[in-house]
Regions:
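Solenoid-like repeat scaffolds
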Residues: 4-15, 40-52, 76-88, 116-125, ...
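"A position-specific structural signal for the A-helix of alpha-solenoid helical repeats
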Residues: 17, 23-24, 57-63, 90-101, ...
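Long, well-ordered mid-to-C-terminal structural blocks that present hydrophobic/aromatic surfaces
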Residues: 19-70
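Structural motif corresponding to the intra-repeat A-B loop/turn of tetratricopeptide repeats
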Residues: 25, 32, 67, 102, ...
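Terminal, low-structured helical/coil segments at or just beyond the last alpha-helical repeat
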Residues: 147-176
Length: 176
C-alpha cells in the first residue's frame, strides 16, 4: 500500500513540475516575443492548469492579443472576469486588456498601471516586470515619452536588483 501511494505521489509531483516548467517557458516566450513557441508550450500544459491558473490564463490572453486574435482574447477575458473568485490583480489586468482591444488606451493604461502597484505591494517582482514590459509597449504606442522614460528606469533598476541578488547568492554558495 505504501509503495502504491509513493508511486502516485511521484506521478503527481512530476506532473506539477512539468506544469511549472511549461508555465515558465510560456512566460519566457512572451517576454522574448516568440509567440509561436508560447502557443506550443501552452498546448503542452494539462487542461486542468489552463483553467485554474490565472497566470496561464493571462499568458494565453496575451499570446492571442499579440498575434491579433482579438476574438479569442476577448473570449478568455470574458470567461475569466465572470469568475467571482478572481483576484484584484488579474481582474484589473484582464479589464485593462479588454480596454486595449476596444481601443480605450487611457483606461487600459490606468488599469494595467494599477497591476504594477498591486504586484509590487505583494512582492511579486516577476509579475511587476511583466506589467512593465506591457506598459513599455503601450507607452510607445501612445507616445507617452515621460512615462516611457520612467518605465525604462524601473526596468533597469529591476535588472540591477536581480543581478545584485545573483551575486549575493553566489557569495553565499562560495561561503558554504
Amino acid at each position: 500500500m505504501n509503495l502504491k501511494l509513493l508511486k502516485e505521489s511521484k506521478i503527481r509531483n512530476e506532473e506539477f513540475l512539468k506544469y511549472c516548467i511549461l508555465s515558465n517557458l510560456v512566460l519566457i516566450s512572451l517576454l522574448q516575443k516568440n509567440y509561436e513557441n508560447g502557443f506550443k508550450y501552452l498546448g503542452m500544459v494539462d487542461q486542468k492548469y489552463l483553467e485554474d491558473d490565472y497566470d496561464l490564463v493571462l499568458y494565453r490572453i496575451l499570446l492571442h492579443l499579440f498575434v491579433k486574435d482579438y476574438t479569442l482574447a476577448k473570449k478568455y477575458i470574458r470567461q475569466s472576469l465572470s469568475n467571482n473568485s478572481i483576484g484584484k490583480y488579474y481582474k484589473n489586468f484582464f479589464q485593462g486588456l479588454k480596454y486595449l482591444i476596444d481601443n480605450k488606451q487611457e483606461k487600459a493604461i490606468e488599469r494595467i498601471e494599477s497591476c504594477y502597484n498591486l504586484a509590487l505591494t505583494a512582492g511579486e517582482v516577476d509579475r511587476a516586470m511583466l506589467v512593465l514590459k506591457l506598459l513599455n509597449e503601450l507607452y510607445l504606442d501612445c507616445r507617452l515619452q515621460n512615462k516611457l522614460r520612467k518605465v525604462k528606469e524601473l526596468q533597469e533598476n529591476f535588472y540591477k536588483m536581480s543581478y545584485a541578488n545573483q551575486i549575493i547568492e553566489d557569495i553565499g554558495l562560495k561561503l558554504n
